[in-house]
């Protein structure tokens, strides 16, 4: 039996109050891991087309006002047809899924690095790394290019180079994947990556991504897309919220805690939103009690507690159905 406990509050609006609280005071690799623990849980759409799948996500995340598809891979104009796939377009893993063995896990379905892409350029991109093309491109469609990498002198194989106006978008997608899925460290198989949780990136790749992140600042469209993904998945991309986080995780400020804004709005430290409690297997007549710690910050009103279950006769009860602001601030344990 699983229980979803929801605490009613007035907390909402873009970056929720306290969302990054558990990352406060952390530096370098510890900061990255703290962010991993914050963003790793998400509700993913299934992969593919149709209702409840990737193309429904794209309908909300990558649709221009005129109904056309926002395509970072080509200048071709194509239009949405409901939640159906679109001829001439692919669901593109910007960080190739073969880099973690092609396992169809959450990263395979994560909209923060999935994009609707021109099929021809996507097939040319294949599973090549990002880079900056030197010499005559293998393919150039006027927006994206494929060819030999000329960035640095470590990796000289084929690479995919997006347009300058999208390089930061790709960099922030890559930083997100390396953080949200840092537990995939042993799976990484890429010219850009190492098999560790930090620093993750080969030195040339890290330099490339950091330069792209710095030179192509986040746009309003990128922010709006991230908010649309957040509404679907329930987790955020911290590198869009705070692009300079990369300096504190990988750059010249790794010994300095990131200066997150002061928290002035009310929020819960525990439990996190959508926390699930596992009662295990219970037989008829069994009794079991689970403790749940509640703690908040900047609270001024009483918290009302309730649960959502699929059946009306759940047999569940709470030791109390409300917690005062002072109780929550000081920390309160309730019994379920």
Regions from the language model: what does each represent?
Residues 1-4:
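Sec-dependent signal peptide recognition
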Residues 7-10:
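N-terminal signal peptide c-region/cleavage motif recognized by signal peptidases
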Residues 279, 287-297:
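Core beta-strand segments of extracellular beta-sandwich domains
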Residues 81:
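Long, structured ligand/cofactor-binding scaffold of large enzymes
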